[in-house]
Amino acid sequence: MQRSTNNLKFKLQILKLLIRNVWEVFILKLIFDTMKTDILAFGAHPDDVELGCGGTIAKLVSEGKTCVVVDLTRGELGTRGTDETRKAEAADAAKILGLSARENLGMKDGFLVNSEEYQMRIVKMIRKYRPEIVLANAIDDRHPDHAKGAKLVSDACFLSGLRKIETVMEGEAQEVWRPKHIFHYMQWKDIKPEFVIDISEFLDKKIASCMAYKTQFYDPTSTEPETPITTKDFFESLTYRAQNLGRLSGVAYAEGFTSERLISLKNFDGIVW
């Protein structure tokens, strides 16, 4: 009788331990799932994301998606403004787009390199926000930082999924995470997009988020040197591109993207035109 009672107690202890472990796993999964971000967008400089895919982000936020932007540099080498003014402007743009968060990795503007140090900074962001989709700079562009940033982010997305690469943030070990998709937005060069997103209802918000960078665009009172994006008609050309991509895809305005791999559709329901 005593032996039977002891066996029962032992089994109950094992059961309690199993239940506790299952509960802990459930809690951890719940925590990680609530920390997940739908879209993590990277830009070599503050304003890259707004110019390249601001309309897409505004649209996704309106649909209830969580979007976070990470700027690689402070844009300190920009012809106009300072890193401090651009920091304030980036915060204003984030409010306009409705971002869940915005961070800056403080990499060296003009000298982006695909180094282990820079890769690991990005890996930590990917593991922190755990996005399904990453948006990154154009794969080829006028500014060398853009293509370098695109490759840097792409490599970091792969490395972030390797279990033997360990990272720690705020004293806690991070879980591995690899995004499902990496899409590159268009910038200065007219790269042929592989797909477009309809931003017809969000062009105004895209333009507003760009204009938050007051020091970077047309200002008739400015005494600072001119740049390719400070001309009076720059936003007209930005609007024209969106309009032209929209014309080609059967909508009013659109933003174009390239993909690092072939995109698979479940069906034709999501096709606009």
Language model: regions and residue ranges:
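A ubiquitous, low-specificity "background" feature that marks scattered single residues
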Residues: 12-20, 27, 54-56, 77, ...
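Active-site rim/loop-helix segments in enzyme catalytic domains that contact anionic ligands
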Residues: 27-129, 258, 270-271
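Short, structurally constrained coil/turn elements
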Residues: 6, 63, 98, 176-178
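Metal-dependent de-N-acetylase/amidase catalytic core
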Residues: 29-40, 116-273
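Short, basic, low-complexity termini and linkers enriched in Ser/Thr/Gly/Pro
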Residues: 1-34
